[in-house]
Amino acid sequence: MPTITVKDGTPIYYREAGQGPALVLLQGLMLTADGFWTKNFDALARSCRVIAIDHRSHGRSGKPLGPHSIAQCADDLGEVLAALDVDKAALAGVAFGAMVMLEYRRRHGNRRLAKLVIIEAQVRLTNAPGWEHPTFGNFPAEAGAGFLAACRQSREPLTGFLAGAFGTPPPADEMARMQLEAWQTPTAAAIEFVEDMIAADYRADLAKVDLPTLLIYGRKNNVPIPSEIGRWMQGEIRGSHLERFEDSGHSPFYESPERFNRTLAEFAAG
């Protein structure tokens, strides 16, 4: 099982295949490098050097007691890229993974990067004056606090989010597999990550992005992100390109894999 041990002693798991331009994949919260990209990894590896990483306390990576933060995951990413001698990579992040990407740029700039792929990302979860794109279309700070309180009482709110991640629900056995995958992240770690996500605000970072950037958003029954945040982000990131997946919800990589794989591979190689 390939891992990179980062400075605090935590082993970070990765999987790698293929040759060509480097494409690094960061999946969403509580999901894994082995399970998340089941419809994508092998197809992308036909034309790219693909590397998928388990965030700390996810999947096969180490499960330290804490603390857990987006910033720590960003620093872990930097150590993995250096250890694998990755340079000029296209870095693709989904949801939480995209937050890790934006935090990486805050802390490390464009080091080892050539392109960004922002997939189903939120840059501020909660409501704010003038902010038209909160999670669920309306997510007051009080709701965030209530969600965290509920998570401390029961695991159910953490794993329940998967039901709203698809425009068309997957088969029951697939949903069960994803639920089991999510259970690999300890509850305490997941709560710390969610707390950090709720506090995060990356809106001002977008205007500073100076790499070619692809934006991918689903538009079918997208419960977490019902608004046109993709169009807004396209206006914030100079020269970015938006791909709207009309037949997918919050999971275009799973619901429209052929188009997703083709779009990502062409962008990485272009």
Regions found by a protein language model. Name each.
Residues 6-63:
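Conserved HGGG/HGGXW glycine-rich cap/lid loop of the alpha/beta-hydrolase fold
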Residues 30, 55-59, 98, 123, ...:
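Alpha/beta-hydrolase active-site loop signature
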Residues 35-37, 61-66, 128-130, 226-227:
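Conserved catalytic-core motifs of eukaryotic protein kinase domains, centered on the activation segment
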Residues 38-45, 51-96, 107-109, 261-262:
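Active-site loop/oxyanion-hole signature of alpha/beta-hydrolase fold enzymes
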Residues 102, 106, 111-150:
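Flexible "cap/lid" loop of the alpha/beta hydrolase fold
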Residues 127-136, 148-207:
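Conserved alpha/beta-hydrolase catalytic His-Asp/Glu region
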Residues 208-248:
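Conserved loop-alpha-helix segment in the C-terminal half of the alpha/beta-hydrolase fold
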Residues 240-270:
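Catalytic active-site module of serine/aspartate enzymes centered on a nucleophile-bearing elbow/loop
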